[in-house]
């Protein structure tokens, strides 16, 4: 099942008990965050605040607050089904020619999906039903959340920032938070390695001193939103990838002020430009780490046009100590990464990014070990293969008999199969998340790899322990007589 716009997804969630309408007045200043946070931690529904204090525009929150709703947005019921998305991405990153007629037939579904890649341009799009320019442009009239007490100002959080570099054929979609600075001003907080910042850098080099056109879409259809947070190949537009996932071409329209294309069914569109000479101090803001981040200088986005649907809905979120909505997205997208990594490293059994580790700062990988030093090879590969893992500080590698998603198993492996000196890899002066204040230098720090696998000859001279495992026949016999023993609540093994 695919959703043409955000509203059809909202209706689907409500029909299935996954969305709650809140008619009681709720203030976007702090109150929405507290309510959304409590509901998310209780694994509750998406929330539609119909009566935000000081505004008549409804606010949608917690849309992707559970992995199940992320899967539902892609027309699936089980987050594990998102591995199909990973299989598609693995194919797109490194397509292989068919090995014969039968293999060619098996690849037909993927080639058929590829036909849905080019976006479809439409006229009279819903996102331009209402047009505001000049003095009508007033960002303060949007119900922008002020998430935490220490935040310096309200913050646009779920905007899809649309850019295009002079050397690129495709447009880039990225999600960068934007601090409200004034009636027509936002601070565009994109880090140097992100697609929007790279496009802007290329533009400045080719067109020094000129204004850079930028568009921000709020409330796009759910597949396009998720396409913007998925590791799409660099040469592919997120619009094209969204078309693949949806099974239908992404509908776009031309922005009114520039040649950029925007999702046609979006709720709200902000059009404008960045002057390369206009910068502003951004922050502090509460972030997904659970701390307020440092302030820094970023470009100012000047909004010249606001267009929106009639009766528009404002899509918002908050970030804080996990679990938060980005952490839940991370849990779901974890399943996307597994097939991509397996294509490069078939020995990988499973891969886990614990949400409490800020969804990317720690990874646990289980492998089918085949030779001495194998765990270290996998560590190095994981750090370097995907850009998403360049900021992962800790990697633990375990054997296939260890459930890498069960901390009881992982801690057991670390404490029984590791020597701290022999089995720890330390690498200094590597890229680190800018928000990681624990690193000695902003953006530069160390990484630790832990080999918690059984050691082979060449890795140890000692006789290695054999795990204790009960005889399977005995277990089956005890299963058969358990009800006769009078012991309640048999543990699940």
Curated annotation (Swiss-Prot):
Q: How does it sit in the membrane?
A: Peripheral membrane protein
Instruction: Name its co-factor(s).
Output: prenylated FMN; Mn(2+)
Gene3D superfamilies for this protein: Single helix bin, UbiD C-terminal domain-like
Query: Catalytic center at which residues?
Result: 287
Pathway membership, UniProt: Cofactor biosynthesis; ubiquinone biosynthesis
Q: Where does prenylated FMN bind?
A: 175-177, 189-191, 194-195
Keyword Iron tagged: no
Q: Which family does it belong to?
A: Belongs to the UbiD family.
- Function (record text): Catalyzes the decarboxylation of 3-octaprenyl-4-hydroxy benzoate to 2-octaprenylphenol, an intermediate step in ubiquinone biosynthesis.
Subunit structure comment from the entry: Homohexamer.
Protein's name according to its UniProt entry: 3-octaprenyl-4-hydroxybenzoate carboxy-lyase
UniProt organism field: Shewanella pealeana (strain ATCC 700345 / ANG-SQ1)
**What lineage does the source organism belong to?**
Bacteria, Pseudomonadati, Pseudomonadota, Gammaproteobacteria, Alteromonadales
